[in-house]
Amino acid sequence: MGGILLTGLLAGSVMAAPPPPPALKDKIGQMLMVGFRGTAVDENSFIIRDIRRNNLGGVVLFDYDVVKGQAGRNITSPAQVKALVAALREAARVPLLVAVDQEGGKVARLKTACGFPATVSHSTLGRLDDLANTGQHSLRLAETLNAMGIGLNLAPVVDLCTNPDNPVIAKLDRCFSADPKIVTRHALSYIAAHHQRGVLTTLKHFPGHGSSRADSHLGFTDVSDTWTRDELEPYARIIEAGQADAIMTAHVFNTRLDKLYPATLSSATINGLLRGELGFDGVVISDDMQMAAITAHYGFEIAIRKALEAGVDILVFGNNLRYDEEIVPRAIAVIRKLVDTGVISEARIDQSWQRIMRLKNLK
């Protein structure tokens, strides 16, 4: 897989001679993934500015603009997306992570209405329980991403379908099964298909969102009374198999793991459980830091500090629940201040930078 990625979707301006050690600001820039408006970019686009000036590490594409309440935010046709992604990647000094939520079924940013191939939901694949079928559909999905130049799929969902009335998981057909073994098998098939096409994947939503009764996009979500350790099994098995490229945290509150903070801000959950107990040393990506589960309870600076202390490597600001063209310089300023004042060590920043470089196949 490594060779494919180096010459494929993450290829960029790789210098012939080893580059000098990056400046702190450049390392911090790699720890951010940001959304933006527009189906095309130019010299005046803030996202191009941040890729060039601030060494922004990743972007995330959306088909629908939540704030404006209209479609066509970044995606209108295959030709348009391919051109957009090429322009974004061309601006990057370090290969850019271009990400999208293309799970399949209801959660697919590249839709048939815009000329993309149809996709199949996790729930349908799990219900059929045919690994060859899952592999076939996943390969077709990954081929679409590859053709667009999109190198990171924010999928598969490995939440268990434990609550059939879950408004954000089961009700949207986003989970393979309530059985962790079925989830694991199909997730591994899904991942293998992506790797065949040089596309990275993201397990989500750690440590488990399947039992929730509420949507963390909208506010506080507590799974303390419904979560079980069975929800960790897919993560444990996929990590053990060496197939976990990146893992996305959930903004769920679980007092059995941390009595004070939701998973994204919880050192006990990420550093303790995910890295310590489950042995994951890859990239941890936050769910969108602009979701109400975070913004309604924590200030911008506190949320960033707690996420970094918890072990998050890439902070996602989708810019789709609220829109801020200065989000990258604002976040960099906060993190630099945390380092300058000794709250966060530069060694901690280096940890994330090294993981991100490994993910991009540069270390």
Regions found by a protein language model. Name each.
Residues 117-125, 253:
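Transmembrane beta-barrel architecture of outer-membrane proteins
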Residues 38, 65, 102-106, 158-159, ...:
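Active-site-proximal loop/turn and secondary-structure-junction residues that shape catalytic pockets
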Residues 106, 112, 121-122, 139-226:
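Surface-exposed loop and adjacent secondary-structure segments within mature catalytic domains
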Residues 129-150, 306-309:
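Alpha-helical scaffold segments that flank or form the walls of functional sites
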Residues 339-363:
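Mid-to-C-terminal alpha-helical segments outside catalytic/metal-binding sites
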Residues 2-13:
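Bacterial N-terminal signal peptides
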